[in-house]
């Protein structure tokens, strides 16, 4: 029997409310700043009451971009979406097929190949990123969607997760498929893929957010303003030296940048949670 402790309930709810407040208050301040004009946003202290310039600020960056030499913000949003979706689709496809081959095909040194993939997790990003940039430059893929997305499609983490899931699938499924005369790809498409849908949903959300939040890679690969992404664009709005940052425009751009990943999480919330729970069973 669980003992009822009112003080513990009050304490846990208080901590929950404080945690939510700590998370939401900066977002509220950003929203308020996005609704103010240039003068009001620099007032000390800045008001916490929303203003009336939100649509004006959004229209300004939507049409004129985030700086004197930048593409319109809608273009940056489109580039970020193409980048995130391409990375997600490619990462899931490559990782799933790699794990399928490692688990279900009996070929020499297959475990060695897996550990060669897995050991890349031990290398810091800083160690891998500059050789990757050199390869992309030699392949003439700078300033292109291919250079922006292809190097980020390989994932040791996703391959490991799919491998662990495939290993718990019963061998009877393979035997039944062989008796029915199914080819490996038929077995993959008709049996393995449907059983992996919850894991796919969880990985889709995580990978999309990972691709959407990329900052350093686009900064190294892209010099064409028409291929710029939102995260790098927002960083470019923050002035250095004696320049003045238009924080109302920065916060408006940040709010627009939040919308796509939030929509993805809300739409796939059930499948995302179910995928995380099922993967631990």
From Swiss-Prot:
Q: Does the keyword Transport apply?
A: yes
> Where in or outside the cell is it found?
Cell inner membrane
The segment(s) forming the ABC transmembrane type-1 domain are: 77-268
Say where the protein is mainly found.
membrane
Functionally, this protein is described as follows:
Part of the ABC transporter complex UgpBAEC involved in sn-glycerol-3-phosphate (G3P) import. Probably responsible for the translocation of the substrate across the membrane.
Extract the PANTHER family matched here.
ABC TRANSPORTER PERMEASE PROTEIN MG189-RELATED-RELATED, SN-GLYCEROL-3-PHOSPHATE TRANSPORT SYSTEM PERMEASE PROTEIN UGPE
Gene that produces this protein: ugpE
InterPro entries for this protein: MetI-like, MetI-like_sf
Report the transmembrane regions from the record.
16-36, 85-105, 113-133, 142-162, 202-222, 247-267
Q: Which organism is it from?
A: Shigella dysenteriae serotype 1 (strain Sd197)
Entry's family note: Belongs to the binding-protein-dependent transport system permease family. UgpAE subfamily.
Membrane topology (UniProt): Multi-pass membrane protein
Asked if the record carries the keyword Transmembrane, the reply is: yes
Q: Which domain of life is it from?
A: Bacteria
An annotated GO cellular component? plasma membrane
Q: Which PROSITE patterns match?
A: ABC_TM1
**UniProt protein name:** sn-glycerol-3-phosphate transport system permease protein UgpE
Q: How does it assemble?
A: The complex is composed of two ATP-binding proteins (UgpC), two transmembrane proteins (UgpA and UgpE) and a solute-binding protein (UgpB).
Q: Which GO terms describe its biological process?
A: transmembrane transport
Per UniProt, the keywords (alphabetical) are: Cell inner membrane, Cell membrane, Membrane, Transmembrane, Transmembrane helix, Transport
């Amino acid at each position: 029997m669980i003992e009822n402790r009112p003080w513990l309930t009050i304490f846990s709810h208080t901590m929950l409310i404080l945690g939510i407040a700590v998370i939401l208050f900066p977002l509220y301040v950003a929203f308020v700043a996005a609704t103010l004009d240039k003068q009001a946003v620099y007032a000390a202290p800045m008001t916490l009451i929303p203003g009336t310039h939100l649509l004006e600020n959004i229209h300004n960056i939507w049409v004129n971009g985030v700086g004197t030499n930048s593409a319109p913000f809608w273009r940056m949003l489109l580039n970020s979406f193409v980048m995130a979706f391409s990375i997600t689709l490619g990462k899931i496809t490559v990782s799933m097929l790699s794990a399928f081959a490692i688990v279900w095909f009996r070929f020499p040194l297959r475990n060695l190949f897996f550990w060669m993939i897995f050991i890349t997790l031990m290398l810091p990003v800083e160690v891998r990123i500059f050789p990757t940039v050199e390869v992309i430059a030699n392949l003439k893929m700078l300033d292109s969607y291919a250079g922006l997305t292809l190097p980020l499609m390989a994932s040791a983490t996703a391959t490991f997760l799919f491998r662990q899931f495939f290993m718990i699938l019963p061998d009877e499924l393979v035997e039944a498929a062989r008796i029915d005369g199914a080819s490996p790809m038929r077995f993959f498409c008709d049996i393995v893929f449907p059983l992996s849908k919850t894991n796919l949903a969880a990985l889709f959300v995580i990978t999309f957010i990972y691709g959407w939040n990329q900052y350093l890679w686009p900064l190294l690969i892209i010099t064409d303003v028409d291929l710029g992404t939102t995260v790098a664009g927002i960083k470019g709005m923050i002035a250095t030296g004696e320049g003045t940052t238009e924080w109302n425009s920065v916060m408006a751009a940040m709010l627009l940048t939040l919308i796509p990943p939030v929509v993805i999480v809300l739409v796939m919330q059930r499948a995302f949670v179910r995928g995380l729970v099922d993967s631990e069973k």
